Structures are given as structure tokens and as C-alpha cells.
Amino acid sequence: MATNKFFKSLLFALTIAINSFGFCIQDAVAYPVFAQQNYSNPRAANGKLACANCHLNQKAIEIEAPQAVLPNSIFEVEIKVPYDTTKQQLGANGKKADLNVGGILMLPEGFKLAPKNQIPAEVKEKNKGVFISPYSSEFDNILVVGPIAGKTHQELIFPVMAPDPEKNSDIKYLTYPFYAGGNRGRGQVYPTGEKSNVNVFGANQSGQITEITVTEKGESTILILNSNGKQTSQVLPAGLILSIKQGQVVKADQPLNIDPNVGGFGQEESEIVLQNPIRIYGYLAFCFSVLITQIMLVLKKKQFEKVQAAELNF
């Protein structure tokens, strides 16, 4: 457990360091590491995934997976995260940037990421440059991916290995539920509760806007004077389009900018059957016996018809 916490802390620190030095800052998003850092289990008791706490807009996703799988088999679970690729989001530096996508797949216990040497070449080609990892050392059945370029990865493919009940007594041949989530674009809230610049900012008091100035960094400073003569100042992040103007009277919490968010998060659930091979063999044997019976009945009928025809001729 201590190793797991150290790994999460290290990953979190690296993420902050990368952002601090400005690498890929235009594509900054709410990294999965934020969820990993703050939630030991990403699925709450009510079924809500942790990603939805930062990605406030709801957008649909789709899941594609086989209905049934055999023990030790490798199969694909595909999460589709569709969006309009002509749209751009507001980057952390206030400039327009393409959207990134990310996904989370919560598999039944025992199911896990397929070993690299067993992943089909076709899947490796599709996932070229994509890094899929377990949520933590404790939950290797929960897989996360992202952030990655959305224009080329609207279909997230997870190669999964099914468990073998013969080797693990805790696994049974049953129908299991699994859960998936996918987001496009940056989050509106950081894990600390602070708003990101992909959000709507409300007026901190009622009153008249006496002055609006823009700094060299592109930030907007808004002065609001209330009826009691108290003046407050608000600073809005760079890149936001204001929905108010100087001299306008506003109410408390009235939006000061147009909603810049073009992304959103969605989650779905489905089921998968861990099929017993013996049942399949039994089913095939049953089908074969039915086929043989049908053939025998047809042959018997033909034989009977020949006997009847011979008696009539006699």
C-alpha cells in the first residue's frame, strides 16, 4: 500500500512538473492521475465515476464488447468518445487548442490488461502511441488511458485478458457487469475545488461594473461597485469571452463570461459472460445429436415411402 501511495505521489508530481515547464500546456486536461491521487476507488456507491466530479458537462459515450468470452482469452473492449473535431477548447494558457480525450474501464475482478506479448498485432497498430495502465496496484482490473489527441483517438481500445476459474477459485462462470467512462476536453473543476479557466465565473456581488481592464497576460480585471459604495475586484482567466460590459448592472453570481466548455464526460455500463468451455462442448454435442436425429428421421421417412410405393405397385 505504501508503494502504491508513493507511485501515485510520484506520478502526480511529474504531471505538475511537466505543466510547470510548459510542455503541451495547450492540451492540458484533468489528468487521470488527479482521480488516482484523490480516490482509492473511482466508482462511488451511487455508481458515479470520479471523473464526473471535474468534468461537469454530460456527453454520451458508447461501449462495444463481446457478449461472452472464454477463460484466458484475449478480447477487446472499445469505448467510443465522439465529438465535433472542428471545435477547439480553451487551453491552460488561454489560447485555443484541440481537444484531448481520456477513458476509464472498470472490469470485473480477475479481468485485467492483456500482456503485451499476447496482444494481437492489429490491436497494437491501432493503439500505437497509446499508454494504457492499471488504476493502481490494488485495482489492476481498472484501466485508464489519456490524455491523448482526440482527433485520432475517438475510439479507445482496451485489450483485456479473461481470468480462468480453474486457476482462481474466487472467479466463477457468471455474467459480470462492467463500467466505462470517457471524456473529451479539459475539466471545469480541479480536485482542490478551484475552477479551471474552462468554466463560467459569476459576479461576487450585486452592483454596477465601473471598470474592465485587460492585463498583458490577457486576464480581465472587473471592478463592481454595490449600492453601499463597496467596490470589489474580480480577475477572470485569459481567453474568456466576457458577457458583460462597463456600466452594466449585475446581480450576485450573474455570469460574467460565456461558457467556454465544449467537452464533457459520459459513463455507461454493460455485461459480459465468462463462458464455461464444457457448456459449449455440451451445446455442440446436443446440436450434433439433434442434427443426426433429423437426418435419421428423413432417411426413415424415405425408406417408409419406398416401402409404401412397392406395396401399391404389387
From Swiss-Prot:
Any single biological process term in GO: photosynthesis
Secretion signal span: 1-30
Membrane topology: Single-pass membrane protein
Transmembrane segment boundaries: 280-300
Keyword Endoplasmic reticulum: no
A Pfam cross-reference name: Apocytochr_F_N
GO molecular function: electron transfer activity; heme binding; iron ion binding
The keyword Iron appears for this protein: yes
UniProt: heme binding residues: 31, 51, 54-55
Organism domain of life: Eukaryota
Subcellular location: Plastid, Chloroplast thylakoid membrane
Cofactors: heme
Keywords: Chloroplast, Electron transport, Heme, Iron, Membrane, Metal-binding, Photosynthesis, Plastid, Signal, Thylakoid, Transmembrane, Transmembrane helix, Transport
PROSITE patterns in UniProt: CYTF
Annotated cofactor note: Binds 1 heme group covalently.
GO cellular component: a single term: chloroplast thylakoid membrane
Database matches in InterPro entries: Cyt-f_TM, Cyt_f, Cyt_f_lg_dom, Cyt_f_lg_dom_sf, Rudment_hybrid_motif
PANTHER family: CYTOCHROME F, PTHR33288
Primary role: Component of the cytochrome b6-f complex, which mediates electron transfer between photosystem II (PSII) and photosystem I (PSI), cyclic electron flow around PSI, and state transitions.
Subunit structure: The 4 large subunits of the cytochrome b6-f complex are cytochrome b6, subunit IV (17 kDa polypeptide, petD), cytochrome f and the Rieske protein, while the 4 small subunits are PetG, PetL, PetM and PetN. The complex functions as a dimer.
Similarity annotation: Belongs to the cytochrome f family.
Protein name: Cytochrome f
Species of the source: Phaeodactylum tricornutum (strain CCAP 1055/1)
